[in-house]
Amino acid sequence: ATARGTHQGVPSAHLTFLLCLDGTVEMLRMPDPARTPGTFDAFVGGLHVEPAVIASGAPQAGLQVDLTWRGARTLLGLPAAALQGDVVDLGSLLGRTAHELLDQLASTRTWRSRFALLEAALGRLAAAGEERGREPLPEVGYAWDRLEETGGTLRIEELAREVGWSRRHLAGRFRDEIGLAPKSAARVIRFERACTRLRAPQPPGLAELAADCGYVDQAHLARDFRELAGLTATAWRAERPDATGG
């Protein structure tokens, strides 16, 4: 039998749209620990600022899409804020469409055909979303884009000035759409950038990584890894198979 273990689902600047073809995903601790854990064969996971704990060890196969907050509104018809800190069964979001898609993917024999099937399904959802026509506030979109462009290092006071809103008004409108305050979003974007650098075949040292990604110092980087990943940076890298070429 395969040994049962766990791995951490760390914060990201994208929502997770996942469909299982073999096995299920068992959430032992939700991104928001106040929410009830569960087992899913298809789900969307919202943006979050704490690590989820996921059971590992059982064989699994599936398809995952990294979904932007804009994509959540287009495909699902709701703001990313509605999913913040949560993992929601796809059937409760898309109804029969979710179950039909899972069945079609399971009966399709090649990965190429599965990708094509999923792409077509997402295209239909996007077209329906465009007909609904509700667009996020352009100021919120601008603010997010600026945080991404700067790797999460832009000061929120400066961001508010660029947008032309008070910091408090920006925080409220941003949170209403995305689910995180701008400061938390910047933190997640910066953390994800550090994770990407750390997974490179020849990663930088932690002091260099901290400086390159806009952390105050190495201790600041270490604190973010403890709080966002539940692990040290070194332990987090060792847990990732592609970090060692596996």
Predicted regions span which residues?
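Nucleotide/phosphate-binding loop and acidic/charged catalytic motifs
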Residues: L170
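DNA major-groove recognition helix of helix-turn-helix
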Residues: F174, A186, D224-R226, R237
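Alpha-helical bundle regulatory/interaction domains
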Residues: A1-R167, E177-P182, T196-A219, T232-G246
